[in-house]
Amino acid sequence: MVAVPELWTLDGFRVMNSDRVTVILKRFEAPDEVRMLQKGRFDLVRLGGMTIGRATYEPGWKWSEHVGPSVGATRCHVEHVGLVLSGRATAAFDDGRVFELRAGELFYIPPIPHDSWVVGDQPYVSLHFLGADHYATPNT
């Protein structure tokens, strides 16, 4: 018979412990940090030495209008690796290249100046596996 590991809740996340391994389970419903933005929010969860972000933006959201002024920038300079969960958005570069990000797509955006905005009338939600620590902070 397999022993059931001890389970307890600590500061909004669950910890499972056995004699060989500790597993930490967290949810975005109880993030470690929330960055409230005009027309959106960026939730951060820190886990296993990494920070994962969840971006949720309303229709009409645009980085240069709703994030840029609060961080003192006209374009985002953060490198991103992520996954689009729902909705559509663009990544637009100053040289005229524009890429659409759609639900189910993994994306990489290099750390060169770019703008982004929600496309259509549905909210946009994505996970960010790289760049979350620096997103929507001064000098991003």
Positions of PLM-derived features:
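Short, charged/polar surface micro-motifs in flexible loops or helix N-caps
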Residues: M50, E58-S64, R88-A89, A132
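Short acidic-glycine-tyrosine-enriched beta hairpin
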Residues: D95-I112
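Glycine- and acidic-residue-biased ligand/ion/polar-headgroup-sensing regions
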Residues: M50, S70-D95
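Conserved short histidine dyad/triad with adjacent acidic residue
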Residues: R54-R75
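A short, N-terminal "cap"/entry segment at the start of jelly-roll beta-barrel domains
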Residues: M1-T56, S64
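Glyoxalase I/VOC metalloenzyme domain signal
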Residues: V2, P59-W61, L130-T140
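Ligand-binding loop in jelly-roll beta-barrel domains
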Residues: P110-A136
